[in-house]
């Protein structure tokens, strides 16, 4: 959520920055709501002033032995009018809050202009795509051996965009997640956290998935207002809800492996085969909570930490800076990591690392205590995939495939795979 002070004091600047990301803010509606809010606030103050004055007059009348009942009747009527105006004010505040919740974050000044992923800017590449003396196969074909990648069984259980993994592929999937967690906890200083996979609606409001992306969420039917997590970012960031963290305890660095559940609304016809776009997938998520002045340094750090996974697995990739029009709703700046897939002869997204500045923190009131002032201030929140496990498995299968269809085990994974060289 944007700072209301910025909206009120520098509306034209906000409108212009939002326009960079293709969002047209209805400034007329904002001004109307703001005027109504001010009018209601003034009306409440006026009623309160009149009531206080009448209360004093009643006291004086009683001290003089005069009949206070006419004045008390007037106070009673004022109280009724005050309650009505307070209810009106709450209605206006709710409309104002709903209006704010629909506004995305402002892009950082360093974010390049652009309308879509076609305008994203490549920052760097690492590694060279492998050369094959045979035509490389798609991961779905490679997984057909011994039926280890079974989409038919998954469809029988759950429908399209699910997969059943068996045997060595299931083990490789588990090994990748364990490798990522060990790297981030042992070398990158993250605290591992096990979190619920069902969260309250307010958690999704807190991180920005709601209200705009409701159709992309899986909501649990029943009396309890639960949603399946679309990303580990949601429960991890919400751990700081309504907290005030002392400065020496910062930064907070949390990592979790969670399943992610997405309806993929709007993705009809995209990546219908294989494991690239699924309703359920595993992801290792990195989250940092930092002091505002350190957040862009933290963004570079979290991106490098996600890159380290790909480097240790020797998977070719590139880093792309997202243009303003391709930014996620809550992000002020984002880097995507894209891994090379030989069967597609192109790079595909495998991680997204974002600085949300104080956008999420304002929604969940995640704060730190500034030792200089002694007062609580909003934190900056960052998140990054470190990495999406299924897509990493796809990349390993395709980049390490052999002519006979077997997959060579990356050196970094051998200890997690029982020391075997191929699977």
UniProtKB/Swiss-Prot annotation:
This is Serine--tRNA ligase. L-serine binds at residues 231-233, 285, 385. ATP binds at residues 262-264, 349-352. Its EC number is 6.1.1.11. GO terms for molecular function: ATP binding; serine-tRNA ligase activity. Belongs to the class-II aminoacyl-tRNA synthetase family. Type-1 seryl-tRNA synthetase subfamily. The gene is serS. GO terms for cellular component: cytoplasm. Disulfide bonds: none annotated. GO terms for biological process: selenocysteine biosynthetic process; seryl-tRNA aminoacylation.
């Amino acid at each position: 959520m944007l700072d209301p002070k910025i909206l009120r004091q520098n509306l034209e600047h906000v409108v212009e920055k939002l326009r960079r990301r293709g969002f047209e803010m209805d400034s007329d509606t904002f001004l109307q709501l703001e005027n109504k809010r001010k009018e209601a606030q003034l009306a409440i103050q006026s009623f309160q002033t009149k009531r206080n004055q009448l209360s004093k007059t009643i006291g004086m009348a009683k001290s003089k032995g005069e009949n206070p009942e006419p004045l008390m009747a007037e106070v009673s009527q004022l109280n009724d009018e005050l309650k009505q105006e307070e209810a009106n004010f709450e209605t206006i505040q709710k409309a104002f809050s709903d209006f704010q919740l629909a506004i995305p974050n402002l892009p950082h000044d360093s974010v390049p202009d652009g309308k879509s992923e076609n305008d994203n800017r490549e920052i760097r590449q690492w590694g060279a795509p492998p050369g094959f003396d045979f035509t490389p196969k798609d991961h779905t074909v490679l997984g057909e051996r011994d039926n280890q990648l079974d989409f038919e069984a998954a469809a029988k259980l759950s429908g399209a965009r699910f997969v059943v993994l068996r045997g060595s592929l299931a083990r490789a999937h588990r090994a990748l997640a364990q490798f990522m967690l060990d790297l981030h906890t042992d070398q990158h200083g993250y605290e591992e956290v096990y979190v619920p996979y069902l969260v309250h609606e307010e958690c999704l409001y807190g991180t920005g998935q709601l209200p705009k992306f409701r159709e992309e969420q899986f909501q649990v039917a029943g009396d309890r207002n639960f949603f399946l997590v679309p990303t580990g970012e949601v429960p991890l960031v919400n751990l700081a809800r309504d907290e005030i963290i002392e400065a020496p305890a910062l930064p907070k660095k949390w990592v979790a492996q969670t399943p992610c559940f997405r309806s993929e609304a709007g993705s009809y016809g995209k990546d219908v085969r294989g494991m690239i776009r699924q309703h359920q997938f595993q992801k290792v998520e990195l989250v940092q909570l930092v002091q505002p002045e350190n957040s862009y340094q933290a963004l570079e750090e979290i991106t490098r930490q996600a890159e380290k996974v790909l480097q240790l697995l020797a998977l070719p990739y590139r880093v792309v800076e997202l243009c303003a029009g391709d930014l996620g709703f809550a992000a002020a700046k984002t880097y995507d990591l894209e891994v090379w897939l030989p069967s597609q002869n192109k790079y595909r997204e495998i991680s997204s690392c974002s600085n949300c500045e104080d956008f999420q923190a304002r929604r969940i009131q995640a704060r730190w205590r500034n030792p200089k002032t002694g007062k609580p201030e909003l934190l900056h929140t960052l998140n990054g995939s470190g990495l999406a496990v299924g897509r990493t498995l796809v990349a390993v299968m395709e980049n390490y495939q052999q002519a006979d269809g077997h997959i060579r085990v990356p050196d970094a994974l051998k200890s997690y795979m029982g020391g075997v060289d191929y699977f």
